A protein has these predicted regions:
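A short, glycine/acidic-enriched catalytic loop
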Residues: 22-57
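Structured binding elements
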Residues: 15
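Active-site-adjacent substrate-recognition loops and nearby beta-strands
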Residues: 27-32, 49, 60, 106-118
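Extracytoplasmic segments of membrane-associated envelope/inner-membrane machinery
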Residues: 42, 48-80
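Single conserved hydrophobic/aromatic residue that forms the stacking wall/gate
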Residues: 1-11
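Active-site-adjacent mobile loop/cap segments within catalytic or ligand-binding domains
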Residues: 74-166
Length: 166
């Protein structure tokens, strides 16, 4: 629809959904990951290096380089800022998601965790990686196969997304 096309960029989120496993069958519960500060800094530096190395010649000279100022147009500060905005928004969404999902599902002791997973490394939009529970736990595994549980968790995800956009 026209409305959804106009709002497309506003509503962009990446929610990567998984189930976890543990050598301990008693380990169970929901968790959500966002990019760690260390991962953020490393990723921003990689993007800056990559962007800075992609200058190519065109008819007008070296693309990506401001010949008057003698420096690359890719501003490291802007890259860092994009990562920080995405990370902050991801953090906010993760906190809301933990609150909503924990109304219907058990959560780990520290349900909001930090990692450097590839799916969390976009500076273009907020992203979270969700572990719904542990396939190695009987209770979690039963939940994964229960349509009522699936539906209630899906509804909690929708509530979290809606609350995040208010």
């Amino acid at each position: 629809s026209e409305r959804s096309r106009g709002l497309g960029d506003v509503y962009k989120r990446q929610i990567s959904i998984h189930v976890d496993a543990s050598k301990y069958s008693s380990t169970r519960g929901f968790s959500v990951y966002t990019l760690s500060e260390r991962g953020l800094d490393r990723e921003a530096e990689k993007v800056a290096r990559l962007e800075n190395s992609l200058s190519v010649f065109s008819k007008k000279g070296l693309k990506g380089v401001n010949l008057k100022k003698g420096r690359n147009l890719i501003d490291h500060h802007n890259i860092n800022e994009a990562f920080r905005k995405a990370r902050d928004s991801s953090f906010e969404f993760a906190e809301i998601l933990v609150d909503k999902v924990s109304e219907r599902s058990q959560k780990l002791t520290r349900p909001h965790r930090y990692a450097g997973f590839a799916v969390l490394k976009s500076p273009n939009y907020p992203s979270v990686l969700v572990e719904l529970g542990f396939i190695t736990n009987d209770n979690d595994r039963q939940n994964f196969n229960n349509r009522n549980w699936q539906s209630s968790i899906a509804n909690k995800f929708v509530e979290a997304v809606n609350k995040n956009f208010k």
